[in-house]
Amino acid sequence: MCSFPCMDFLNDLGENRYMKRIKLTVAYDGTDYGGWQVQPNGVTIEEILNREISGLTGEEIRVIGASRTDSGVHALGNVAVFDTKCSIPAERFAYALNRRMPEDIVIVRSEQVADDWHPRYQDVITKTYEYHIYNASVPNPMKRRTSTFVSFPLDIDQMRKGASYLIGEHDFVSFCNVRTNTSDTVRTVYDIMIDQNGEDICIRITGNGFLYNMVRIIAGTLIRVGRGFYTPERVKEILEAGERTEAGVTAPPQGLVLVEIRYGNENE
């Protein structure tokens, strides 16, 4: 039985229940979580969603997520789905769940999708990430959860030149964690923009998909370009080398945000 608190829009729904698949767009501050995926140690985003949706619907719910972000990584537009017989209208799940969620997790929107719609195996057109850097002589405590602090001046023009070599279809094996669980390391990067607003630097990257830690390794490499440790042309050499050890360090998680996942034919 759906346990959603009595509201006017439910008064005339009756008991005609059928299974439906609900898609959620989820935003969160990942600082205090052990990542997306349920694990034995530490509270995760997936765990909170399972708990609160189950409490709302009175069913045992297990969400399926699009991107299993790491501990400390944030999102503005991660995606999850779940199946339910609860009679709450699909578009009202966001409101109902936000009444239950902790302040650092927000359901941006909810909608019904086809019963076989899957957030990972669907037609993903693009994914967009941002990596945020606070570039100043001393840290800003107000930005410590959402930006990576770099005290040495960064040359943005050099970083942009280095980033240009990453645009297009390439084998990004040099830019992924050695634990990447895939044999296909070819991805297409459509665009990389690096913007600076005072002491804030944002690396925004859009592609058809990303390997494990790929964006953070790209950010770590471009930071080395910005500091003058690498020339921009070194990025091309790293790409061609096909060796993880050639690239820069994996940048810390707090600067990374999953901004958006765009799908084709979502409701077909």
Question: Which sequence ranges carry the predicted segments?
Answer:
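Structured-RNA-binding interfaces characteristic of tRNA pseudouridine synthases
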Residues: 8-268
